[in-house]
Amino acid sequence: MESSGLDGVRWIVEDAMKFVEREVRRGNKYNAIILDPPAYGRGANGEKWVLEEHICRMLECCAELLERKNAFLVLNLYSMGLSSMLARTAVHQAFGVPKFEQMGELYFEDRSKKQIPFGTYYRFKR
């Protein structure tokens, strides 16, 4: 990480929902949040994560963690049932309407240039 200049970055590899709830309780703030949640998952103790059921709560917690100025959020969604417009609406409900935002489709392009979708993204900066 040092050679890339990212030695000051803290990578979190634990249950993301538990982490953000704990950080909210501690009153911590962040300049950047990158959310890359799975569509579905199970925790070590049998906890179940379903993106459609938990993403709004995750965004509400992240809204409390993200600094009000000079900050950004990136959200990737890998559920074909969630469009970039739905992501935008959920982010607006949690954070308000930002001055700068982008959204679109995540896709692979095959050898014949056919675009194969696998999710959506939404990002904003303040």
Sequence positions of predicted segments:
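Mobile active-site "lid"/loop adjacent to the S-adenosyl-L-methionine
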Residues: 13, 30-61
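C-terminal catalytic and target-recognition region of SAM-dependent MTase-like enzymes
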Residues: 70-126
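Secondary-structure boundary elements
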Residues: 3-7, 67-68, 126
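S-adenosyl-L-methionine
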Residues: 1-34
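Short, glycine/acidic-enriched loop or turn micro-motifs at the edges of active sites
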Residues: 17-18, 39-40, 79
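A generic structural signal for well-ordered alpha-helical surface patches
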Residues: 56, 60-63, 89, 120
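Short, well-ordered secondary-structure micro-motifs
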Residues: 22-24, 44-46, 85-86
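Short glycine-dipeptide loop
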Residues: 61, 66-73
